[in-house]
Amino acid sequence: MIETDKLAAERIIAATPSSSHEEVFERALRPRQLDDYVGQEKVRGQLEIFIEAAKRRSEPLDHVLLFGPPGLGKTTLAHIIAREMGVNLRQTSGPVLERAGDLAALLTNLEANDVLFIDEIHRLSPVVEEILYPALEDYQIDIMIGEGPAARSVKLDLQPFTLVGATTRAGMLTNPLRDRFGIVARLEFYDADQLARIVRRSASLLNAHIDPSGALEIAKRSRGTPRIANRLLRRVRDFAEVKADGQITAAVADAALAMLDVDPVGFDLMDRKLLEAILHKFDGGPVGIDNLAAAIGEERDTIEDVLEPYLIQQGFLQRTPRGRVATLLTYRHFGLSAPDAGNERGMWDTPAGK
């Protein structure tokens, strides 16, 4: 898992933050209210209604679960929810809450209607999760005082609050935890026009000169992810300041992204390495995940968690009962002729591999 996180941090088109410096940069560009939030129209519309209703009743917003791929704005929405409700936000993450006391300390310091944001909520330990259940339902927690035979349970009342949980792996949440969220929202990948709007907004905040075609060129290579779009914008801005008098046009963006090995559909060297291995070493597939990992010198987890999701989502890769298979789009992308349909049908005949 450490190697997977390391690779994700090193890729310019990775959807996870690459450093604490980048997190500071993200905060500077983060929209502060729902009206400024681009994309996710369905989720945004729902939150507008639920937040306004809660404010009219002077109640905390129902607990909110946000899930979807990294980099799509879950943390941003948590901050916006707190700001729209006019309350404080306390932020933590699942791995940080190692003991029940860690969570109890956070909960007992919340003021009325505050928002507690737990990122990576699927990584909460079972003992911490058990403490959370009564807090979510009854605004109470039970803590143990003392040790051994003298230990006793003390019930503490909490201020009403809203939990906003964020996860990239909703399937890893336990059913009891998932059932305690009154509002569940999935964030989807953005289209190029939405990302171009985000790029133009970010460029304005950075005092970068960009024309609509330059913003669209960056957007098309951003893998449907605002975090990647903003990261690419920073690098293209650097290139433009040195090579193009600070003017970001489509041609300048294309040259900058080519220098970074980000191709017109957002693939980098690792994406191309994986797809080319399937095409050339395994005749387009099917190939089992372990064989593929050995062929490209990467860990299985890295392929499944870092490389594959976008390739599958965009239709360049398929998981079949017999392994990974390159699609017609992949052959076209690399300028190759696809095998005839008769050969492809054989991929699905008998389950084998992983």
Curated annotation (Swiss-Prot):
Binding positions (ATP): L29, R30, G71, K74, T75, T76, E137, D138, Y139, R180, Y190, R227
Top-level taxon: Bacteria
Reactions listed under catalytic activity: ATP + H2O = ADP + phosphate + H(+)
Assigned EC number: 3.6.4.-
Matches recorded under Gene3D superfamilies: 1.10.8.60, P-loop containing nucleotide triphosphate hydrolases, Winged helix-like DNA-binding domain superfamily/Winged helix DNA-binding domain
Annotated DNA binding sites: R300, R319, R324
Compartments where located: Cytoplasm
GO molecular function: ATP binding; ATP hydrolysis activity; four-way junction DNA binding; four-way junction helicase activity
This protein's GO CC annotations: cytoplasm; Holliday junction resolvase complex
Positions with a binding annotation for Mg(2+): T75
Ranges that cross the membrane: none
GO BP, one annotated term: DNA recombination
Renumbered residue ranges of the record's region Head domain (RuvB-H): 264-354
UniProt entry keywords in alphabetical sequence: ATP-binding, Cytoplasm, DNA damage, DNA recombination, DNA repair, DNA-binding, Hydrolase, Nucleotide-binding
InterPro entries membership: AAA+_ATPase, AAA_lid_4, DNA_helicase_Holl-junc_RuvB, P-loop_NTPase, RuvB-like_N, RuvB_C, WH-like_DNA-bd_sf, WH_DNA-bd_sf
Coiled-coil parts of chain: none
HAMAP family named among the record's database cross-references: DNA_HJ_migration_RuvB
Subunit structure as annotated in this protein's UniProt entry: Homohexamer. Forms an RuvA(8)-RuvB(12)-Holliday junction (HJ) complex. HJ DNA is sandwiched between 2 RuvA tetramers; dsDNA enters through RuvA and exits via RuvB. An RuvB hexamer assembles on each DNA strand where it exits the tetramer. Each RuvB hexamer is contacted by two RuvA subunits (via domain III) on 2 adjacent RuvB subunits; this complex drives branch migration. In the full resolvosome a probable DNA-RuvA(4)-RuvB(12)-RuvC(2) complex forms which resolves the HJ.
Functional note: The RuvA-RuvB-RuvC complex processes Holliday junction (HJ) DNA during genetic recombination and DNA repair, while the RuvA-RuvB complex plays an important role in the rescue of blocked DNA replication forks via replication fork reversal (RFR). RuvA specifically binds to HJ cruciform DNA, conferring on it an open structure. The RuvB hexamer acts as an ATP-dependent pump, pulling dsDNA into and through the RuvAB complex. RuvB forms 2 homohexamers on either side of HJ DNA bound by 1 or 2 RuvA tetramers; 4 subunits per hexamer contact DNA at a time.
Family: Belongs to the RuvB family.
Protein name: Holliday junction branch migration complex subunit RuvB
Gene field: ruvB
